[in-house]
């Protein structure tokens, strides 16, 4: 089932972000990874089912672009063969490795080519935008919220990745606490409604489409 996380701020360390990721280690017990970039932070907890080699670990990169996905892409081998004929090369047998090539070929229309259940976060370095999306049926969970300290958006597979729980019992955290726990004080924690996608560009904010 895996776990994905993303945060658009730069006020949280990778180590602290990984602590939030590890709260749901049962979703991704095989491996965990956190990366930093112009977009902020992105994390993945792996439950290895397909593409079991190290090359199947996410985030998947092509240049400065990257993606994490909790999902299953049915019939992905058909799309993969089409992409291979168009010159794309693949390092693993993981279904989610085709996501960036699909995005390059079709942009946001990529979802029309996906017979799948998914929750994903993708960074496009050329347009400097972060894209979060969820499958039309809503099988794979994806929550989001905004940090009180910097008003940056965060996404995660489970609510507990985004809230501090017992570690912040005060109604309004102190400035020191807020600085160390930007994800601990989320304004709202709705689940992204299916079908759903959001694009984010600094510093202009967000645009959403449902």
Name each region found by the language model.
Residues 1-210:
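Cysteine-centered catalytic environments shared across enzyme families
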């Amino acid at each position: 089932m895996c776990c994905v996380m993303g945060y658009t701020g730069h006020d949280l360390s990778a180590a602290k972000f990984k602590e939030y990721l590890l709260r749901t280690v049962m979703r991704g017990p095989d491996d965990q990874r956190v990366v930093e970039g112009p977009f902020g932070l992105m994390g993945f907890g792996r439950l290895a089912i397909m593409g079991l080699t190290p090359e199947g670990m996410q985030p998947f990169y092509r240049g400065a672009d990257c993606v994490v996905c909790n999902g299953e892409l049915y019939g992905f081998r058909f799309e993969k063969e089409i992409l291979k004929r168009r010159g794309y090369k693949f390092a693993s047998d993981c279904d989610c490795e085709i996501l960036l090539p699909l995005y390059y070929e079709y942009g946001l229309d990529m979802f029309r080519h996906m017979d799948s259940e998914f929750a994903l976060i993708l960074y496009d370095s050329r347009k400097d935008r972060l894209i979060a999306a969820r499958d039309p049926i809503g099988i794979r969970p994806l929550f989001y919220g905004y940090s009180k300290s910097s008003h940056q958006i965060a996404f995660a597979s489970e609510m507990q990745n985004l809230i501090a729980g017992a570690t912040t019992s005060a109604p309004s955290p102190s400035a020191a606490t807020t600085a160390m726990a930007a994800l601990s004080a989320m304004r709202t924690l709705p689940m992204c409604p299916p079908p759903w996608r959001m694009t984010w560009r600094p510093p202009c904010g967000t645009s959403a489409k449902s």
